[in-house]
Structures are given as C-alpha cells and as structure tokens.
C-alpha cells in the first residue's frame, strides 16, 4: 500500500520536519509513505475574492497533476467528516479491501482547496472546527495515519 500526502507550501520549521520524519520512519513498516510539497501561490494583501479563486485554481492544477487516476483521495476540509481514530483506522483498512493501492491525502494552502479538488476527492475529512496552521496539520495527520495502522495491528500505542 502507498500513502501519499500532497501539501501546498513548503515546510520550514525544523521541529515539524523532525516530527514528520519520525512518523515517516515508523510508517515504513506498514506502507510506502510519500510527502509531496507543492509551491504555493503568493496571496497579495487585500486580495479580492476573484484573486483568491485564481490562486486556489492554480494550486489545484498542481495538486491534480500529483493525484493518480486510481488513487483513493481524502481531502482535508473544514466541512468534511470527523472520525474517532478507530473509525479512521477502519476507513484506511477498508480502502485497501475495495481494491485501491494508493491513498492520497491532500492539505491545501492558506486559502483552502479549490472545488475541483473537493469534487475529485472520494471523501472530505475534517479534524474539527479549530483552525490549525497547515504545516502543523501535516504532523497531526501523519501521526493519525501511523495511529490508524497501529490500531489495526492491535498495538498498545493507541490507548
């Protein structure tokens, strides 16, 4: 199984890179994990609605190029479904049973995701109504993916 994490923007903070790297190492026992960082568009101060739409559209084009035709896509969006960790674990296990070999998670840029990406997604997922920095969300999501595999394995990691 392959798990891809497509993110808009480059990760700069060392502590976040270190945390993600640790979970990538742990995930290597269960799957091939790949984090793809895409260039984000600069958002001008006082950008108009049309400017924001254009920016999200450009970012969506970059994202779309990295999604495989047969990928099961989960896009993170505030309006998405929320799951307890156990249900998330069942979801990941169930995707492979349905014949998908790649699960692709998408974290958009500071403006969010264009509707074309949300429509392509098999599922929209939310971590709640809190606003988190997109860079921190990468670490949180990577840990939850690892936790999902550990739950499936029956490990005491998830208590």
UniProtKB/Swiss-Prot annotation:
Homodimer. Specifically methylates the pseudouridine at position 1915 (m3Psi1915) in 23S rRNA. It comes from Streptococcus pyogenes serotype M3 (strain ATCC BAA-595 / MGAS315). It catalyses: pseudouridine(1915) in 23S rRNA + S-adenosyl-L-methionine = N(3)-methylpseudouridine(1915) in 23S rRNA + S-adenosyl-L-homocysteine + H(+). Signal peptide: none annotated. Keywords: Cytoplasm, Methyltransferase, rRNA processing, S-adenosyl-L-methionine, Transferase. One of its GO terms (cellular component) is cytoplasm. It comes from the Bacteria. The gene is rlmH. S-adenosyl-L-methionine binds at residues 76, 108, 127-132. Its EC number is 2.1.1.177. Belongs to the RNA methyltransferase RlmH family. This is Ribosomal RNA large subunit methyltransferase H. One of its GO terms (molecular function) is rRNA (pseudouridine-N3-)-methyltransferase activity. It is found in: Cytoplasm. InterPro entries: Alpha/beta_knot_MTases, RlmH-like, tRNA_m1G_MTases_N.
């Amino acid at each position: 199984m392959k798990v891809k994490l497509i993110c808009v923007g480059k990760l700069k903070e060392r502590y976040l890179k270190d945390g993600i790297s640790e979970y990538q190492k742990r995930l290597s026992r269960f799957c091939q994990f790949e984090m793809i960082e895409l260039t984000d568009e600069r958002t001008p101060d006082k950008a108009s609605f049309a400017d924001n739409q254009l920016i999200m559209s450009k970012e969506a084009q970059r994202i779309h190029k990295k999604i495989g035709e047969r990928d099961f896509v989960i896009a993170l969006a505030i309006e998405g479904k929320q799951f307890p960790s156990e249900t998330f674990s069942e979801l990941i296990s169930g995707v492979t049973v349905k014949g998908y070999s790649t699960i692709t998670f998408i974290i958009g840029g500071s403006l969010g995701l264009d509707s074309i990406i949300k429509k392509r997604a098999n599922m929209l997922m939310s971590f709640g109504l809190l606003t988190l920095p997109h860079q921190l969300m990468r670490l949180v999501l990577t840990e939850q993916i690892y936790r999902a595999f550990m739950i499936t394995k029956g490990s005491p990691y998830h208590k």
